[in-house]
């Protein structure tokens, strides 16, 4: 199941290219070498984004919510997203190369999946060596089978250094989606000499609006099914870390085919 979900995601990005987007068996188009999946710059870029989200989580903005484990967390995802969006004009002014996202889009996706694996492993180790309250134990992730437990997650809401890991993964998914959209649109406008493709902009804007709405009502995340009933395993982390590369596939497709 772990391999299948990853294979489906990678297949979506290999089947749709600049020249065609036809249904076919994905195995013929899947890259066969390690270098086709792993890029050090992309891995460090995703890690840097995760570090930024982690640092921003300590901003004294937004309401505080008590999680199922009894830990109080600051719901400042909306302010984090706004701050990063407001940073975009500064990046353009400083002539920062934003083409990295488009050129290494596939590598960024695989890097996100790699970090999803690492994050799930951290959650597994925390549950093993620093278990939380009994109410935080996921019965479906405590079977004794390492693969099943790693996939399902032994705990619902593990925390590390005062940060809820599940909330961080949730922010990664939505804030990441918004930023990728904005960067793709900005880079597209700049590459076209200032000409705006309204279809691309509109498709991207709806996705950014979705992320803004989700982050504005972030405090209700802990009442969702994922927060209350899904263990923090690779099943969840891979889903959240890969999410930015599903809606943005539409934006990238429109840019490639314009």
Where do the model's predicted regions map?
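Membrane-anchoring alpha-helices and their flanking helix-loop junctions
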Residues: 1-257
């Amino acid at each position: 199941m772990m391999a299948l979900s990853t294979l489906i995601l990678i297949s979506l990005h290999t089947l749709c290219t600049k020249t065609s987007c036809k249904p076919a068996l994905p195995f013929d188009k899947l890259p066969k070498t390690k270098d086709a999946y792993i890029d050090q710059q992309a891995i460090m870029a995703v890690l840097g984004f995760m570090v930024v989200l982690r640092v921003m989580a300590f901003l004294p903005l937004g309401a505080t919510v008590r999680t199922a484990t009894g830990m109080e967390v600051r719901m400042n995802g909306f302010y984090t997203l706004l701050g990063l969006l407001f940073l975009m004009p500064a990046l353009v002014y400083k002539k920062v190369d934003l083409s990295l996202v488009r050129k290494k889009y596939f590598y960024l996706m695989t890097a996100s999946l790699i970090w999803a694996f690492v994050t799930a492993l951290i959650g597994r180790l925390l549950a093993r060596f620093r278990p939380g309250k009994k109410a935080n134990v996921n019965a479906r992730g405590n079977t004794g089978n390492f693969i099943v437990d790693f996939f399902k997650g032994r705990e619902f809401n593990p925390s590390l250094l005062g940060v809820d890991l599940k909330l961080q993964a949730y922010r990664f998914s939505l804030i990441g989606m918004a930023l990728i959209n904005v960067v793709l649109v900005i880079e597209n406008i700049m590459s076209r000499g200032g000409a705006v493709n309204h279809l691309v902009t509109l498709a991207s804007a709806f996705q950014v609006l979705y992320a803004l709405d989700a982050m504005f009502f972030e405090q209700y995340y802990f009442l969702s099914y994922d927060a209350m009933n899904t263990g923090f395993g690779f099943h969840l982390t891979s889903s959240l870390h890969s999410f930015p590369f599903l809606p943005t596939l539409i934006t990238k497709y429109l840019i490639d085919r314009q």
